[in-house]
Amino acid sequence: MRKTPFIEEALHEKLINVSSLARVILPEVSLLLKKEVKIGAVMMAINRLSPANELRIRKNIKKLALDLGDVIVRSDLCDFTFKNTTSLLKEIAKILSKSADSNDYFLTVSQGIFETNIVTSKNLQPYVQEIFKKEILINSVVNLASITIKLPKENLEQSGIYYFILKQLAWANIPVQEVISTTNEMTIVVKDKDVNETFSILMDMKLN
């Protein structure tokens, strides 16, 4: 349990059935103790468990949430995912150069091992389609919006800050299209129809 503190959180909020959890961890408990253990004993141990880790993590994250900086919203975005190729980097350089022509352009590039994701403002969409026309398009989505959160510098030392933020959106049944991060910024990309609710949830985190 101490290895998975977020299970403690779910237990504290009564989101996990104690009996079901006991059945799941019973084999591991028996193995550790090297003897047969009854499920009732495991349930009693879980119920007596002090949520120290969960409360400490929650307190620290809550403090960070109150210290969140500016929240910036952008709409009319497009999302493209291309297969990584030897020519792709040259094309990325072209779209980066184009995006520098105007402050109205928005562009993020995230390169993975096998694919590269590009999120752009709608006014850059024709240039992306032209520049990358010979590349292998894996997926594209339009009618998106992004919310960028300025994170306090302490976020690097606190586990669970991303979990805490994304959990709120998951509970609201908001599908996150992309998550883009730098050292002290987190950008969440959602569908246009979900941006108002997403913004409201994030502001509630700052204010409450």
What are the functions of these language-model segments?
Residues 1-31:
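Long amphipathic alpha-helical segments
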Residues 26-42:
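Short, positively charged loop/turn segments that connect secondary-structure elements
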Residues 8, 12, 16-19, 37-208:
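A conserved regulatory-domain signal marking ACT and ACT-like small-molecule sensing domains
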